[in-house]
Amino acid sequence: MYDKNGDEIPIFVDQADLDRFKQLSQQLAGCHSSLEVMPDQLPGVFNDGNFTLGESIADLGGVEIAFEAYTNRLKRQGFEGNQLRLQQQRFYLAYAHLWQAKYNALYAQELTLGRNELVMGKNVHSLERERVNGVVMNTDAWYDLFDVKPGDKLYRKPEERVHIW
């Protein structure tokens, strides 16, 4: 990172900051590694959370920042109560729609495991469904807006949710 004069700004102030970042990063990698890819067609094939970690951190941070900025703008425009809630829900629906995709098992397996030379090779991004699910299940607002409770498929306990930035 750089300041307005082009001088480098350290991302981590001290070793404790760096250690906490590494701990949270591993939590996020574990979360993404728990996501099964196309369970009906590829049972037992899971996302590689360590391989996709950099992009998963970027996705999570980006969504959290965008949601906060969007919410602040809505409030400045006078949205409140149920109307604010509806617009916030639409944010998450738009995010999911953005990553909507359809692919076959061979494609999914290749991008997840990188075992077939016919396709592009292993991808540093999670597949679309896992990319969305891995983000929303770590954002507290999603639980409130969609009334996600223990026992629901994408539920994570509050202490297990990862907030890096």
What is the meaning of each model-derived region?
Residues 1-165:
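Zinc-dependent metallohydrolase catalytic domains
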